[in-house]
């Protein structure tokens, strides 16, 4: 071998140190369980998100709903063409009342988790203007597509009646 021994040792042992020599059995089992049920979970995510978007589009405190399944513009046409099994679990909307109404909405949620990540089986909500984008000026925030009252939801697989009830309560108290 013409490679320096230090490189060979590092290439072999750093990966083992950081990642382990193999996947633990419990982790392998959980990955298999997750893969076997991913289609069921994604269908539930998509179904719930479509119902939430429809609910939000009819609520008097909501000024705009951002969901591919509702869009009648060019993006909506592309979504209808390419997303045959559903439009995903993400749904955004804007409230009347500005930044304060967005924060009050989040504060009044009971079932939704207030976190910045997406893709969980649980329903998640975030108000970017007071969290992930709070360091930006109002102009910069708008330039990134985030209005002061914008709320982003990642809709989970809970029962749709529970999801809509929690959203309705939070909207009524925002």
Model-derived features: where do they sit?
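PLP-dependent enzyme catalytic core of the Aspartate aminotransferase-like
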Residues: 41, 107, 123-174
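Active-site C-terminal subdomain of aminotransferase-like
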Residues: 1-90, 94-122
């Amino acid at each position: 071998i013409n490679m320096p021994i230090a490189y060979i040792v590092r290439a072999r042992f750093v990966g083992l140190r950081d990642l382990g020599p193999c996947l633990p059995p419990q982790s392998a089992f959980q990955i298999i369980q997750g893969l076997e049920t991913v289609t069921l979970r994604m269908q539930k995510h998509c179904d719930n998100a479509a119902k939430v978007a429809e609910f939000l589009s009819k609520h008097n405190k909501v000024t705009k709903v951002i969901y591919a399944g509702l869009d009648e513009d060019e993006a909506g046409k592309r979504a209808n063409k390419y997303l045959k099994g559903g439009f995903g679990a993400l749904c955004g909307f804007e409230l009347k009342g500005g930044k304060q109404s967005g924060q009050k909405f989040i504060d009044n949620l009971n079932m939704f988790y207030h976190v910045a990540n997406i893709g969980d089986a649980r329903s998640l909500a975030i108000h970017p203007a007071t969290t992930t984008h709070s360091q930006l000026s109002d102009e910069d925030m708008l330039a990134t597509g985030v209005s002061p009252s914008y709320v982003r939801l990642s809709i989970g697989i809970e029962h749709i009646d529970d999801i809509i009830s929690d959203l309705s309560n939070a909207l009524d108290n925002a």
